């Protein structure tokens, strides 16, 4: 798997988990202290998230880091 494929896969997983909670991008952004545009870029695979960003997102979504990136 390439780096770009991995970023897109993680982005799709974030979308899936976020929508399961009934959250908008703004809701997730508030919960993990990011702005909506940052969440949008993550979900679209436009940026390479840091481990800490992934941790914050998993914590906000109430899932393990492992589940977020599986």
Report each predicted region and the residues it spans.
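A detector for short, charged/polar N-terminal pre-domain segments
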Residues: 1-9
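Short amphipathic helical patch at the helix-1/turn junction of helix-turn-helix
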Residues: 8, 19-20, 48
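Short basic helix-loop element that most often maps to the first helix and adjoining turn
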Residues: 12-31, 56
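Conserved hydrophobic/aromatic packing and binding residues within compact polymer-binding modules
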Residues: 14, 28-29, 39-42, 68
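Recognition helix of helix-turn-helix/homeodomain-like DNA-binding domains
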Residues: 33-47
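Short, conserved catalytic or interaction motifs in soluble domains
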Residues: 44, 63, 70
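DNA major-groove recognition helix of helix-turn-helix/homeodomain DNA-binding modules
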Residues: 50-67
């Amino acid at each position: 798997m390439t780096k770009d494929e991995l970023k897109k896969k993680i982005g799709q997983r974030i979308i899936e988990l976020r929508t399961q909670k009934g959250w908008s991008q703004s809701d997730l952004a508030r919960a993990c202290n990011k702005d909506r545009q940052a969440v949008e870029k993550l979900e679209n695979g436009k940026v390479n998230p840091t481990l800490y960003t992934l941790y914050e997102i998993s914590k906000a979504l109430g899932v393990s880091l492992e589940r977020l990136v599986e």
